[in-house]
Amino acid sequence: MGKLLADKLGKLANKPVVGDVDIEDDRVFEHRESGSDSDMDSGDEELKKAHYAQVGESKLRKQLDSEKNLQELDTKYVGSVGSREDIYGENASSGSDSGSDSELEDDESDAPANDLQSNDESESVESESEESDHESGSESDNGEVLRKIVEKETRQAMNRISDLTKRDASKGYSILSQNKFFENILDTRIKLQKAMNSANVLPVTKASWKLELKEDSENKKLLEENLSMVENLLNRVINFRIDIQAKEGISTDSKLETSKKRDITDLNESTDALDKDLKKYRTAVLQKWSAKVSSASGSSAMKSSKFKAVNQSADAQVENQLADTPRLIKRTCLNRRNVLPINFTEDMEQGRLTKFESTSNTGENNDEDENADIPKNYDPRRKDNNAIDISTNPYIFDDGDFYRVLLNDLIDKKTSSANLGVTSSATNSAIIVSKSNYKLKKNVDTKASKGRKLNYSIQEPIANYEAPVSSGYKWSDEQIDEFFAGLLGQKINFNEDSEQDSESDVGDEEEAIKNDDIQIFA
């Protein structure tokens, strides 16, 4: 039952001026607190900016006001044009649906009250269901678009990462293959070391070869077999080099043929031609990678160290090392193992070794006046000092210093890999580590610097030598008297001649007294 007009008027008349508010209800004061906070914040901001000077807009902001200027400045700030249907999908049709719903509501407003109430309830239920359907559809469409964008970006990132990993993997594989190839070459060089040492013992002259071949008939047969095998090996090496240089695009001489049978002179000529072609390619490759490494490490930017040998290009370092060819050849002629070829002394005595005589003559002319009392061929470090100086022998080949450097590099490399746990054999790694530690260990006394300790060396005892033992030699009385007189600052005359003269004078005087014919009797 509806309220009467009198009741409504009484309620309005009795309404208090100040409304009754529940102080425990937080929702009542939310709008008031937010309003007061906003007023306080705005007041604080105005107080903070009260001392600011009025400044107009900058030129850059004015230029960026228009989209045209923005496009002219940089294209990366311009977005792509799109439609709402691409983003929201079916949300665009929701507006038309809502418009039709409002029209239906206006038409149905003239219906009776009961029908209107029932229609309102049914329409509210339908509108709620439709809105929920539209919201779920729009959310699903937005999620689909975002999912596609994320998938696209992840696909691009994975492709980029896969390209980088493939590039890094190819670089690592090439480095591993190069290291493996170098280790194979070094292994071959190690196996050839014994053969090179044995080759230095072979006879030098033809006369010595004839003498050795006469003693044993099998030597001639073995020598011919070895010569044929060496020639075959050299031919295969030349053919391999020709194929490799042709495959790598290195310009080779057209006269060189892979199927040609060559003798010793042809082998030397082919080797020289291949080395000449390879030198240009080697220089270009060294320059390229040297420049890349220096630019990556930043060593080229240091002006103070650019003239050092280490910071120069790799090809310049190689050329500097190969510039002094006579010195390098002389180093290969050093007899580090004291090898003496067969019948070498006989060949030297008979004057068959022309190279050895020329080098010895030049050395004698240079050291003509130095140490004339010491023999020319004497060396105190050698156990046997023969008449022939074999410290430098032009008829041998010994590159022990270079071979030692290669071995040290190999040991260091294996040591580092052993420390990282890469080696497969534990025993080999332990041996290599022990060798490297022995190599790096130095017997240095750290307390012997700045004169804090006397440096001395102990002389080794001489073998098969016994020093003479003194048989109690003593001083004479005269030496003892002279020693003590010298300590006291006195002088004693020990001249025997003067004493004899004085004694003879005394004797003559006594004889003269006896023979004066005057006798005195007591």
Curated annotation (Swiss-Prot):
Chief subcellular location: nucleus
A Pfam family per the record: AATF-Che1
GO cellular component terms given for this protein: nucleolus; small-subunit processome
Superkingdom of the source species: Eukaryota
Keywords assigned by UniProt, alphabetized: Coiled coil, Nucleus
GO BP: maturation of SSU-rRNA from tricistronic rRNA transcript (SSU-rRNA, 5.8S rRNA, LSU-rRNA)
Residue segments, region Disordered: 26-145, 356-385, 496-522
InterPro entries listed in its UniProt record: AATF, AATF/Bfr2, AATF_C
Biased composition (Acidic residues): 100-110, 118-133, 496-511
Subcellular location: Nucleus, Nucleolus
Keyword Nucleus in annotation: yes
Biased composition (Basic and acidic residues): 26-35, 58-75, 376-385, 512-522
Family designation: Belongs to the AATF family.
PANTHER family: AATF PROTEIN APOPTOSIS ANTAGONIZING TRANSCRIPTION FACTOR (PTHR15565), PROTEIN AATF (PTHR15565:SF0)
Name recorded for this polypeptide: Protein BFR2
Organism of derivation: Candida glabrata (strain ATCC 2001 / BCRC 20586 / JCM 3761 / NBRC 0622 / NRRL Y-65 / CBS 138)
